[in-house]
């Protein structure tokens, strides 16, 4: 009895920055970094991010993804990688990989791993940074995601909800620019 897992590297399979799966597809507006194409000159004849948003709105992204990886096997791991993002365009001290993993029961977790020796120190400090930020912002109404350190990784709880970016995008799309501006400045004032 074979089982299959589908993965979708983005922007392509040669230089993926992010890898999605059927268990974690991109959100609308997330596929906006399409300038990475190192193997040949490329003309951009249309706004690709708008096309991706249309595909996502119609649940068609897997059928039109630029590339895919299909893993087939008899056994599936207990903890399955649903999403991976590589932050290798940063300074080597912050060159990390973020993974979202899930279990059969639907539980999800977020882990950050160092991709370089220099980034290990950054990962080891994330738990303390999380605690310090929680203390700093506790009176502001901002909750900081809980972090616990592991052996060469930092784990965060997976949170469901609407991001500030998604809320701002919705307000702008609805033409509510005054509300979007007010919301943005409310948050910038909170984190000053």
Regions found by a protein language model. Give the residues of each.
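Short beta-strand micro-motifs within the conserved protein kinase catalytic domain, predominantly
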Residues: 141-153
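Feature marks short, surface-exposed loop/turn motifs that line or immediately flank catalytic pockets
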Residues: 12-14, 117, 162-163
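Residue-level recognition of conserved beta-strand positions in structured domain cores
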Residues: 8, 113, 157-158
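Conserved kinase catalytic-core helix
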Residues: 126-141, 165-192
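Rossmann-like AdoMet/SAM-dependent catalytic core
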Residues: 4-93, 97-99
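ATP-binding glycine-rich loop module of kinase domains
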Residues: 82-132, 167-168
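Conserved short submotifs of the Hanks-type protein kinase catalytic core
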Residues: 151-163
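Conserved catalytic/acceptor-binding region of the Class I
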Residues: 1
């Amino acid at each position: 009895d074979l089982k299959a897992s589908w993965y979708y590297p983005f922007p392509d399979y040669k230089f993926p920055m992010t890898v999605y799966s059927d268990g974690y597809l991109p959100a609308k507006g997330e596929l906006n970094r399409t300038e990475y194409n190192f193997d040949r000159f490329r003309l951009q004849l249309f706004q690709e991010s708008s096309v991706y948003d249309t595909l996502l709105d119609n649940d068609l992204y897997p059928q039109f993804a630029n590339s895919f990886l299909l893993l087939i096997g008899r056994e599936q791991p207990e903890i399955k990688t649903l999403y991976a993002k590589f932050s290798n365009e940063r300074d080597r001290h912050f060159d990390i990989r973020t993974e979202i993993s899930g279990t059969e029961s639907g539980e999800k977790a977020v882990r950050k791993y160092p991709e370089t020796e220099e980034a290990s120190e950054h990962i080891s400090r994330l738990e303390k940074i999380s605690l310090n930020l929680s203390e700093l912002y506790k009176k502001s109404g901002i909750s900081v995601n809980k972090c616990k350190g592991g052996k060469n990784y930092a784990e965060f709880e997976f949170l469901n909800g609407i991001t500030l970016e998604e809320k701002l995008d919705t307000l702008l799309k609805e033409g509510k620019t005054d509300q979007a501006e007010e919301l943005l400045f409310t948050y910038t004032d909170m984190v000053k």
